[in-house]
């Protein structure tokens, strides 16, 4: 099994190109199930999760041609299965995204209950209740969601009790081919959701309210869609992770291929800590701070501070002068990285969904274990300032969401190698 070995790094320098957003690529891939034409998708991130979903689509009967690791063409005219099997779905929670498109197009599907990061319960109840509201009969048997909509899905008023990104995306795709109007209240408005809506809108689905938390979708009544070529938006979480790597070493680095307006919550917090920025249309340069001030974070839905960045900022907090506080409001059990950061010497105390981090903590390299995707990136960030050598194990979590991580970090001057145990 692979692991990463990182030796304390000097000040970083140079530039890094940000990959396409994994969390946009996955619903876009699922949405190709709604198409009647060949769909070309560019700027895909070369990560395990994208390959997993592509494999699932191929199992269903989608013809996929890879042009390069970041570009493919899908043709979904000959779907032969509507059963998303456990062997593939168990590897990634986002596989649930095929539920809406399959049910909307075929009126029947079976989708294995998903796997992925072990972060709290993250139930699929919200997806199921919404589909039932649209006329589906759903049962859970033998670890599968078995969904049937005789006569097809019908538009409905969907009120999400809690904002859910994948739930919103699933219902948006289900509503695309449904009969009549679907009104989604309390929809997620992350950039990845917005891109999905924009693509469907350009493909023949009338959608009102894009970018807000109320959406009205006029379904095509079963008529399949025509997609133009798609370019996946840049990954704001990957960008934020590299900003934290630059920040913890108090370096000046440049990110290329970014959407600065998607990064406001992250860059605002870094400015509060003491960093500056030079911004141009699609690039961003981090400027060093005179000193690193402590901070407070409350994770919340977009445009608030993203839960996918709290672990990396926790690593950064160990080098800030004073006490920082992080409150996690979106997911339970999302502090699993704390014990591993403590192994490096971090002074962190937990109380419920609050973490208190005292800095400045001198960190010392050790063997640590990744527990989920973003927690593993926090260990990478912390290891950059840890004396000696840090070995990060179970990095298959990193490979799920970060493209060529060690190569990009090496380009910035990090002493990092991938080894086999």
UniProtKB/Swiss-Prot annotation:
It comes from Helicobacter hepaticus (strain ATCC 51449 / 3B1). GO terms for molecular function: UDP-N-acetylglucosamine 1-carboxyvinyltransferase activity. The keyword Cell wall biogenesis/degradation applies. Its EC number is 2.5.1.7. It is an enzyme of class 2 (transferase). Cell wall formation. Adds enolpyruvyl to UDP-N-acetylglucosamine. Pathway: Cell wall biogenesis; peptidoglycan biosynthesis. It comes from the Bacteria. This is UDP-N-acetylglucosamine 1-carboxyvinyltransferase. It is found in: Cytoplasm.
